[in-house]
């Protein structure tokens, strides 16, 4: 069958042989939940951490490239126990793994999760919003003890995107690919993305106070 498909995967669920077969079967893109390779942070939030160190992540990324599969990766900032210095280590993880596209999200302690309960008990940090409408990974709804203000955490997410996407090596690689494919739509999309990165307009700003929908944890 002539199929083109994509999927999500964890780095400890694939190997070189599986990725080769996936590529041969039409898989063109895998979204990996890398999150972080900083052990000090991963142990606080990730339960299944076997074979999830930085070297494993880099190896899986290389196997994916060899199989002709595009790599998208998710990375987190604002993790329990995080400081700005540790967040920068996670950002460096992303650069070392070097996926085709990286998504940086703020940890969001959704109601009912173990993390939300622990924060409510005074562990890890404090909530800064109880508005259910604000609970997504693009908004800062809680503040780890390692940060001084919500703005500092929001700025860290902005820094992550700029640090990853505005690298000369990354820009040149994307330009080379666009020239090779001749995809004008892709070129326009990348230009708009670059402008948004410089302006910081790709993030949802911290909301002003308004009537909120209170959450019970």
Residues of each region from the PLM?
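Detector for C-terminal structural segments
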Residues: 181-184, 192
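Residue-level signal for secondary-structure boundary elements
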Residues: 165-172, 183, 187, 199, ...
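A structural motif corresponding to the C-terminal lobe/cap of the Radical SAM core domain
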Residues: 1-182, 215-217
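Short linear elements at protein peripheries
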Residues: 189-217
């Amino acid at each position: 069958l002539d199929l083109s498909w994509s999927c999500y995967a964890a780095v400890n669920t694939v190997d070189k042989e599986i990725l080769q077969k996936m590529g041969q079967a039409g898989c063109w893109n895998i979204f990996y939940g890398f999150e972080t390779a900083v052990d000090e942070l991963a142990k606080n939030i990730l339960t299944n951490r076997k074979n999830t160190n930085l070297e494993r992540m880099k190896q899986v990324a290389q196997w994916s490239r060899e199989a002709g599969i595009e790599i998208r990766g998710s990375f987190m900032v604002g993790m329990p126990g995080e400081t700005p210095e540790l967040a920068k280590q996670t950002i460096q993880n992303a650069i070392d793994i070097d996926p085709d596209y990286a998504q940086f999200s703020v940890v969001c302690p959704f109601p009912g999760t173990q993390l939300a309960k622990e924060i409510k008990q005074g562990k890890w940090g404090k909530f800064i919003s109880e508005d259910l409408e604000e609970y997504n990974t693009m908004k800062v709804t809680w503040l780890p003890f390692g940060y001084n203000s919500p703005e500092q955490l929001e700025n860290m997410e902005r820094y992550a995107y700029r640090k990853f996407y505005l690298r000369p090596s990354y820009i040149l690689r994307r330009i080379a690919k666009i020239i090779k494919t001749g995809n004008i739509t892709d070129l326009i999309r990348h230009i708009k993305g670059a402008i948004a990165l410089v302006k910081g307009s790709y993030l949802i700003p911290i909301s002003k106070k308004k009537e909120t929908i209170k959450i019970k944890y």
